[in-house]
Swiss-Prot record:
InterPro entries: DNA_glyclase/AP_lyase_DNA-bd (IPR015886), DNA_glyclase_Znf_dom_DNA_BS (IPR015887), Formamido-pyr_DNA_Glyclase (IPR020629), FPG_cat (IPR012319), MutM-like_N-ter (IPR035937), Ribosomal_uS13-like_H2TH (IPR010979), Znf_DNA_glyclase/AP_lyase (IPR000214), Znf_FPG/IleRS (IPR010663). The gene is mutM. SUPFAM superfamilies: Glucocorticoid receptor-like (DNA-binding domain), N-terminal domain of MutM-like DNA repair proteins, S13-like H2TH domain. Monomer. This is Formamidopyrimidine-DNA glycosylase. Keywords: DNA damage, DNA repair, DNA-binding, Glycosidase, Hydrolase, Lyase, Metal-binding, Multifunctional enzyme, Zinc, Zinc-finger. Its EC number is 3.2.2.23, 4.2.99.18. Binds 1 zinc ion per subunit. SMART domains: Fapy_DNA_glyco, H2TH.
Length: 273
């Protein structure tokens, strides 16, 4: 599933292409379960004629800011992608949402596995989306002190805590493994047991792993592309994730894969304590 870097890059590459454009109509919606709120009929009606004024990201949601105070929130889930296509481009069978713009271009939401989701939110809906998610790890407010506060008193293992979107928003399996490797912390360590130095190292590890991925265009393991259709290259720079049986780049020990909170988890048994 695309995580914070991939979602940010998808949002940026989509937003810069369509900001200022007006959505004339929803031209295709053949998988109505994609729309979580409002009803599919209301979604189609309310989107028509809305102009795109800006874009953003919250957690793993792509946000398009529309006139009238509405926000179109799109979640790529496992296999979703958003691209801008010429006026005459035909959607394939996996393109379940098509938005026609006033200059004739089309926005395709393609999702072979049909896990992607769309929400059209008013101000209250947007506030609820914000409230459901925790701190943004690349924000100025996410300091070492703030991370220490979030971990204090929590006896859960550190990796599932990092994956909890209500605590820290946007981190998934890839960047949890990469951040913990950078911080030299075992994924099963209780969060409340981390020392002040380890919390600081984890804070640095989280931000460094995410920033590296942004620099490298995100991680493409199978489906991810940005809205220009470009693959990321960050998968070529993993230190722990998806490197089972390979040597640790830091100490040479063999990277192990185990299961933590029902998620495949990669770590170095020597470096990470």
């Amino acid at each position: 599933m695309p995580e914070l870097p991939e979602v940010q890059l998808a949002a940026d590459s989509l937003g810069v292409q369509i900001v200022g454009a007006r959505i004339v109509r929803v031209e295709r919606l053949d998988w109505t379960r994609m729309v979580e709120t409002p009803s599919p009929d209301e979604f189609i009606t309310l989107l028509a004629g809305r102009q795109v004024h800006g874009w953003g990201r919250r957690a793993k949601w792509i946000l398009l800011f529309l006139d009238g105070g509405w926000t179109l929130a799109l979640h790529l889930r496992m296999s979703g992608s958003l691209t801008v296509q010429p006026a005459d481009a035909p959607p394939d069978k996996h393109t379940h949402l098509v938005l026609r713009l006033d200059d004739g271009r089309q926005v395709f939401f393609r999702d072979p596995r049909k896990f992607g989701r769309a929400r059209l939110l008013d101000a209250d809906g947007r506030a609820a989306l914000d409230a459901a998610h925790g701190d943004e790890p690349l924000s100025n407010a996410f300091t070492v002190e703030r991370l220490a506060e979030l971990l204090r008193g929590r006896k859960r293992a550190i990796k599932p805590l990092l994956l909890d979107q209500a605590v820290i928003a946007g981190i998934g399996n890839i960047y949890a493994d990469e951040a913990l490797w950078r911080a030299r912390i075992h994924p099963l360590r209780p969060a409340s047991d981390l020392s002040a130095d380890e919390v600081a190292a984890l804070h640095d590890g989280i931000r460094a792993a995410l920033r590296q991925a942004l620099t490298n265009g995100g991680s493409t393991l199978r489906d991810y592309r940005n809205s220009y259709g470009t693959r990321g290259t960050n998968q070529d720079h993993f230190n722990a994730y998806d490197r089972e049986g390979q040597p640790c780049p830091r100490c040479g020990a063999t990277i192990i894969k185990t299961v933590v909170a029902q998620r495949g988890t990669h770590y170095c048994p020597e470096c990470q304590r």
